[in-house]
């Protein structure tokens, strides 16, 4: 019981959860994130998932879907830079990407393949605007590997210190 209390306190001191009972636009979310940053100095923001954000009606009239996402992601980049925090944006794959499976004869034959950058809802804007792109993939229907997460590094902006993308077949 003491360990549980200690763990809860640790989590509360290191993480804040923004109420998920409200649907935010990216503008409202950044306003909330700024208010929290002013009160509590955090270093990272996770948006999970991006497609849970409502479209800002003012911007939606000006841009098509791709341009809208590009604009929002640019705003997130600026916020990240101005507030000196890392922002992680979780995305889901498009339906067609979920239908792509490993070929016959492959060790994962018939299992859904990991996403590529362009496979997320909103497409290439996410890969274009992000410094780094990581795909966390699980084969939940695999008889033995259902509990493992395969981490595919799809993009690394800064490679001078040794960072690099992982080979597609070797996450």
Residue ranges and their predicted role:
Residues 1-41, 166:
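Cytosolic-facing regulatory segments adjacent to core modules
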Residues 23, 51, 93-95:
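Active-site-proximal loop/turn and secondary-structure-junction residues that shape catalytic pockets
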